[in-house]
């Protein structure tokens, strides 16, 4: 069953402050001001609805959308209707849209982006008044905290919402406020509901591994941390965030989720439960490996202090203590379930593994800058990307479609795309290949290609590989559950991947984002035996780790709660891994457990607001570029190289600290000023500060290794960086022409230079606002920049008028009709220009021009005339205006008109014997009924 997204309000705290924290608004007004967002459903939203007695029948909602679609279809054929009929249809459409809005809108749940601590304190102390109702803080999940966002709820129901979502936990059990925030916030995770499974909770399993590390000891204040290589013995939780699910329960959930396959892994959510379930034949294991015994220990104890036993024949899900965050706040599973039932809390699945993995992995600069690559390696790595972009051409329509719409298409998929409510200009291209002559469509394709090239300069190139779920050996897991000493099916240096085994690949490079240090590339030797094929047979996808190494430490402290791992078999990348690099380790601070108060919660919020992870990642990129520059000039055996290298390790530690910042509820060390701030040294300063000769020497040294310059390729990441670079080059270009009467490029390429020219170039590079060396990413960037993809000649932006007859209706409009369309479209163009950026990946601003479109149609009284007015507005009278608005407003009706002229389309489909080559696969053009 499809579930539409829920509409909620979202404000910036500065807006609330401007109006004295009191705002009165309607849904339509809030939507026009971009203060309405759409969120996937969650337990928190379901609880609020239940308290309010509001039930959303999502099947009924689909009927509403179908009814609205029916009215749209009638309007699309309104050339044959009377003016009165059109007005009735428009009115009915407005009424059903209002019903949809009313059904999906939840005014009790509002998100606020906190822009100052004073705003936060005011909202927590006094609340905000929205439409006459008082709202106070309800929650702040870890993800929301990183974006300085809180959820507020109306005072009318907030106490009951908290009481239900607290789910009867034992409040006398000490708990860190920051942890509680994160656990309580899990109820706002987007989930699809599934039936309650029969489950047990088991203890986690830990063992140790001894290995050598770069150990970081934090030094307070404006100083580098101490980094020393030493051997350590570290305990690892092999079941961290992971549980098991039987194939029969996995099949049941798959059916409930509307899937035609059994996912190898499911994400899991329930009150204070979070993690991943791996599909594994737990009952078969008990029968064959555990000697037919199904009796196992659970985590709970009876009154005599003995572990309560469970018969696994009666259960289908095994949950670890690390998944059940507050297991010790309940007497047992029955107590927990009783509370779940009383509070009407449902089991949910946020995500699940796909039926098939992709065959192409998009790399990124973090993955690439941490490799040992030379110029030839860069060319080889970029070859598939260059060939991919070079293949896009006006003359190769089939390739163009694959570039625009992707691969793995089916007839059903093409039809679903044609019926969907977005990308209408692309639909027009599919319906009629002649639309490739449209200047607007060509400009869209040109922009897309240019964007792909720019992203390529940033490291977004393609290699064989994909992302898969990280899994801890489920065979060893079941051994642990059954009380058998875990040996697993994988040795200390073994890993498993069905995907790669099917392709005969025995070694891959594993990478987990965000990737900061070289050791986070792990060469994985893949194992395949009759035993692995039998017991891992439900893991069609997923990367299985052994229970004996320290791989999770290399992967930045990964766990198994649905973390994903990138793997590639690309030989250049595998060769480029620093195979003997040590991983980073530090003593991470632990949060204080206590009976927390509201004040503790507020402190935890404030500590967790904002994130400087991006800044730390940038500093590591700066350091990699600087390290390459130092190597080129001075080699590795010098203090400059050693300190810069040490800072890369410290960046890794700082990033880990920032990720855990919200969990521990206190500030962590970030980037020392010593790394980025230039310290002036003149005679007066030296005298006034009393600097010794050694002090001056040290200051000069640290000034020489500042991480204050972005690498060259970052000009494609930040517009400001590009502007500074371009301005600097222009100034020096002019100076070069004035001084030497030649271009800068010519001067650089001169074999023999005068002392003055050498000095000019030395200064040019010294004061360059970016680091210009041969680091892997800088080389890659310059290589792609140097290729002439001939976009202008392949995708020319010719005159568009020839395509207008392809999209117009057979209808004549009047001047009065045009003026109606002109007025409304002009308003929509202003609104489109002012669209804000309030959202993140999990939410989207609700922008809907359909009511404006219907208004034009109803006032003109004819869809054909209305569409033709709009087409002429953009193509005849205002050709420079943004045609995105034309397709947003009238795309549905243009496509309906085009579909009447064609019953089939031709589309490139996967075909092993096909004659169309694209990204290493073959396709053939096939007829598709629409």
Question: For the regions a protein language model found, what residue spans apply to each?
Answer:
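Conserved small-residue
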Residues: 1-556, 572-575, 594-930
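A short beta-strand element within the Helicase C-terminal
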Residues: 564-567
């Amino acid at each position: 069953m499809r579930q539409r997204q829920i509409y909620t309000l979202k404000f910036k705290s500065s807006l609330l402050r401007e109006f004295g924290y009191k705002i009165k608004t309607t849904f339509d007004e809030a939507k026009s001001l971009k203060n309405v967002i759409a969120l996937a459903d969650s337990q928190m939203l379901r609880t609020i609805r239940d308290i309010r007695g509001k039930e959303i029948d999502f099947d009924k909602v689909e009927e509403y959308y179908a009814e609205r679609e029916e009215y749209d279809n009638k309007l699309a054929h309104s050339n044959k209707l009377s003016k009165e009929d059109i007005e009735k249809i428009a009115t009915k459409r407005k009424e059903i849209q209002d019903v949809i809005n009313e059904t999906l809108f939840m005014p009790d749940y509002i998100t606020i982006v906190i822009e100052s601590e004073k705003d936060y304190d005011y909202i927590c102390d006094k609340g905000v008044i929205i439409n006459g109702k008082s709202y106070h803080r309800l929650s702040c999940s870890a993800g929301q905290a990183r974006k300085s966002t809180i959820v507020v709820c109306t005072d009318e129901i907030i106490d009951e919402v908290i009481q239900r979502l607290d789910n009867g936990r034992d409040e006398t059990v000490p708990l860190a406020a920051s942890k509680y925030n994160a656990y309580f916030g899990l109820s706002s995770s987007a989930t699809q509901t599934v039936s309650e499974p029969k489950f047990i909770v088991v203890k986690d399993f830990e063992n140790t591994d001894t290995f050598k590390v770069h150990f970081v000891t934090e030094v307070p204040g404006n100083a580098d941390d101490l980094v020393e290589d030493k051997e350590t013995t570290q305990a690892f939780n092999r079941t961290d965030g992971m549980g098991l699910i039987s194939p029969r329960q996995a099949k049941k959930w798959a059916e409930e989720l509307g899937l035609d396959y059994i996912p190898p892994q499911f994400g899991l959510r329930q009150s204070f439960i979070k993690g991943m379930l791996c599909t594994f034949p737990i009952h078969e294991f008990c029968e064959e490996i555990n000697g037919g015994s199904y009796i196992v220990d659970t985590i709970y104890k009876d009154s005599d202090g003995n572990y309560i036993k469970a018969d696994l024949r009666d259960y289908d899900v095994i949950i670890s203590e690390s998944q059940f965050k507050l297991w010790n706040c309940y007497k047992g599973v029955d107590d927990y379930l009783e509370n779940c039932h009383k509070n009407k809390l449902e089991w949910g699945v946020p995500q699940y593994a796909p039926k098939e993995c992709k065959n192409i992995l998009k790399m990124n600069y973090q993955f690439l800058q941490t490799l040992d690559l030379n110029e030839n390696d860069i060319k080889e790595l970029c070859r598939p990307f260059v060939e991919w972009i070079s293949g896009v051409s006006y003359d190769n329509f089939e390739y163009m479609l694959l570039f625009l719409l992707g691969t793995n298409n089916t007839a059903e998929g093409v039809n679903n795309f044609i019926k969907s409510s977005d990308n209408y200009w692309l639909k027009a291209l599919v319906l009629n290949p002649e639309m490739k002559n449209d200047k607007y469509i060509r400009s869209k394709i040109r922009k897309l290609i240019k964007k792909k090239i720019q992203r390529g300069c940033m490291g977004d190139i393609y290699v064989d590989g994909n992302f898969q779920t990280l899994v801890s050996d489920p065979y060893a897991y079941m051994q642990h559950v059954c009380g058998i000493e875990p040996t697993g099916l994988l040795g200390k240096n073994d890993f498993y991947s069905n995907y790669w085994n099917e392709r005969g690949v025995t070694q891959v490079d594993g990478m987990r984002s965000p990737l900061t240090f070289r050791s986070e590339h792990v060469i994985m030797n893949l194992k395949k035996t009759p035993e692995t094929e039998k017991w891992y047979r439900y893991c069609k996808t997923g990367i299985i780790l052994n229970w004996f190494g320290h791989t999770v430490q290399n992967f930045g402290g990964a766990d198994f709660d649905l973390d994903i791992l990138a793997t590639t078999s690309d030989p250049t990348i595998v060769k480029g891994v620093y195979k003997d690099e040590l991983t980073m380790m530090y003593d991470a601070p632990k949060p204080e457990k206590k009976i927390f108060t509201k004040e503790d919660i507020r402190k935890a919020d404030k500590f967790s607001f904002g994130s400087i992870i991006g800044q730390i990642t940038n500093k590591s990129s700066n350091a990699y570029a600087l390290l390459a520059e130092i190597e080129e000039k001075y080699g590795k055996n010098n203090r400059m190289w050693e300190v810069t290298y040490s800072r890369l390790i410290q960046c890794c530690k700082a990033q880990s600290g920032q990720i855990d910042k919200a969990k521990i509820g206190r500030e962590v060390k970030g980037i020392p000023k010593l790394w980025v701030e230039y310290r002036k040294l003149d005679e007066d300063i030296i005298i006034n500060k009393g600097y010794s000769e050694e002090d001056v020497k040290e200051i000069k040294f640290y000034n020489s290794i500042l991480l204050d310059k972005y690498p060259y390729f970052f000009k494609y990441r930040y517009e400001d960086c590009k502007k500074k670079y371009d301005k600097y080059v222009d100034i020096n270009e002019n100076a070069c022409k004035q001084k030497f009467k030649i271009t800068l490029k010519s001067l650089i390429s001169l074999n023999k230079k005068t002392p003055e020219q050498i000095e000019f170039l030395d200064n040019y590079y010294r004061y360059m606002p970016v680091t210009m060396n041969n680091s892997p990413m800088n080389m890659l960037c310059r290589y792609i920049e140097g290729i002439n993809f001939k976009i202008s000649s392949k995708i020319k932006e010719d005159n568009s008028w020839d395509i207008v007859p392809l999209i117009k209706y057979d209808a004549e409009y009047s001047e009065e009709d045009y003026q109606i369309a002109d007025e409304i479209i002009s308003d929509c163009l202003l609104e489109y220009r002012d669209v804000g950026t309030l959202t993140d990946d999990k939410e989207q601003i609700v922008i809907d021009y359909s009511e404006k479109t219907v208004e034009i149609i109803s006032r003109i009284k004819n869809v054909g005339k209305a569409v033709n007015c709009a087409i002429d507005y953009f193509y005849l009278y205002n050709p420079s205006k943004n045609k995105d608005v034309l397709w947003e407003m009238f795309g549905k009706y243009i496509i309906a008109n085009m579909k009447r002229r064609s019953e089939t389309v031709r589309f490139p489909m996967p075909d092993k014997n096909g004659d169309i080559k694209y990204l290493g696969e073959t396709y053939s053009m096939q007829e598709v009924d629409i």
